[in-house]
Amino acid sequence: MNNRVHQGHLARKRFGQNFLHDSSIIDAIVAAIHPQPGQAIVEIGPGLGALTEPVAERVDEMTVIELDRDLAARLASHPFLQSKLNIVQKDAMTVDFAALSAERGQPLRVFGNLPYNISTPLMFHLFSYTHAIRDMHFMLQKEVVNRLVDGPNGKAYGRLSVMAQYYCQIIPVLEVPPASFRPAPKVDSAVVRLVPYATLPFPVKDLSKLATLTSLAFNQRRKTLRNSLGNLFSAQQLAEQGIDATLRAENVSVELYCRLANVLAERTVSQD
């Protein structure tokens, strides 16, 4: 028996497909999402509809984004779902979520069992639309969830942690074992809730500066800030912002990275 075949569909490795089949896990995820009629519900990667069906039972309509044309066609001909679904057959990395929100006239509620091979870049894509998103619930590799939620001095704290926590409050929901999927992945999974801040706790004037800073710092995470950020700040300039130059990237809080990004932004403005 080919364990990559589920409900007659062969899971495609290039799309990172692993299909959820554990009913108790499905029920727990849908309860966490708590979809309601009238809300702008968007699912990324509905696959064979394990989450789509129970969510659709609770709403009048929803949008699904599915790259796999065979799965999109399957959903379009589904006897129960076809009348409720707006199917967008394209790569979620190319979707304008602000336009989707504008069409519905309200912020989106986004959820999905994200393919592990695109989960991090897809979240960075979604962060640029947080003004149009009410909340997000994602099934991810457990390691990625750890990176999302970890704080300074934590083993998993990194650039993803800083950028995600800049935009969103992040709440772990539940852990999911490999046996809950077909085919079973080689890693544990977890569900996480991301709620974009209505008011950013540490506003940054130029987000490109925060992106630059975190890339420089975490790409050389074993170096001290004196070395990794030495081309941008002297030890004295770091000290003026309350940062010890002998610290490493993982020791610096989101607030302090935002403070440094604003210093860089002000410096750029003064040079213009």
Swiss-Prot record:
Reaction catalysis annotation: adenosine(1518)/adenosine(1519) in 16S rRNA + 4 S-adenosyl-L-methionine = N(6)-dimethyladenosine(1518)/N(6)-dimethyladenosine(1519) in 16S rRNA + 4 S-adenosyl-L-homocysteine + 4 H(+)
Entry keyword set: Cytoplasm, Methyltransferase, RNA-binding, rRNA processing, S-adenosyl-L-methionine, Transferase
EC number(s) on file: 2.1.1.182
SMART domains: rADc
Recorded superkingdom: Bacteria
Pfam families cross-referenced by the UniProt entry: RrnaAD
Annotated localization: Cytoplasm
GO molecular function: 16S rRNA (adenine(1518)-N(6)/adenine(1519)-N(6))-dimethyltransferase activity; RNA binding
Residues the entry annotates as binding S-adenosyl-L-methionine: 18, 20, 45, 66, 91, 113
GO cellular component, one term: cytosol
Main location group: cytoplasm
Family: Belongs to the class I-like SAM-binding methyltransferase superfamily. rRNA adenine N(6)-methyltransferase family. RsmA subfamily.
Function noted in UniProt: Specifically dimethylates two adjacent adenosines (A1518 and A1519) in the loop of a conserved hairpin near the 3'-end of 16S rRNA in the 30S particle. May play a critical role in biogenesis of 30S subunits.
Protein name stated in the entry: Ribosomal RNA small subunit methyltransferase A
Organism: Sodalis glossinidius (strain morsitans)
